[in-house]
Amino acid sequence: MYTTRASRHIDAPPSAVYQALVDPADIPRWRVPYGMTCQVHDFDAREGGTFRVSLHYDTADGTGKSGARTDTYHGRFAELLADERVVEVIEFETTDPLLQGAMTLTTTLVAMDGGTAVLVVHEGVPDAVPAADNEAGTRMALERLASLVEGRSAG
């Protein structure tokens, strides 16, 4: 198991970024790498609340962890600190023992330079998930998050 970190500055206040982290309608718009679509099955954004999300590959050559072209994960919100931090404990839905086990995803927001510094720390990632893929997917999601939230702040 390993840990990845990714960060990005977003030109919007922490409150706007936090809202996108906990709004189930926003999740499919940003929390997905390019080449995939996102489906939110359940999403109860409160401490102890649970969620279930699937990422579907757009092309036939995508190999999923939960199915032929799908990565499904579920989890719970371990901590929600408005405008500051979201801590999630997540697990892939898979029969592959090399992909099983709980991971912790911590997103920290800090007001900085008229916007928000966002740090995502993904701990306990199974070694069977290539670190470069995990890092790239997180960076793509942060790029989408920035586009979504900055677009709202500019409007």
Label each region the model flagged:
Residues L148-G155:
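Short, highly charged C-terminal tails/helix-capping segments
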Residues A78-E79, V87-R139:
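Beta-strand/loop substructures that line and gate deep hydrophobic ligand-binding cavities in soluble
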Residues M1-C38:
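Hydrophobic ligand-binding cavity/cleft-lining segments
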Residues V17-Y18, I27, F51, F77, ...:
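Hydrophobic pocket/interface hotspot
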Residues Q39-E91:
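Glycine-rich portal/gate segments that line the openings of hydrophobic small-molecule binding cavities
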Residues I10, L21, L55-Y57, F92, ...:
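Short beta-strand segments enriched in hydrophobic/aromatic residues
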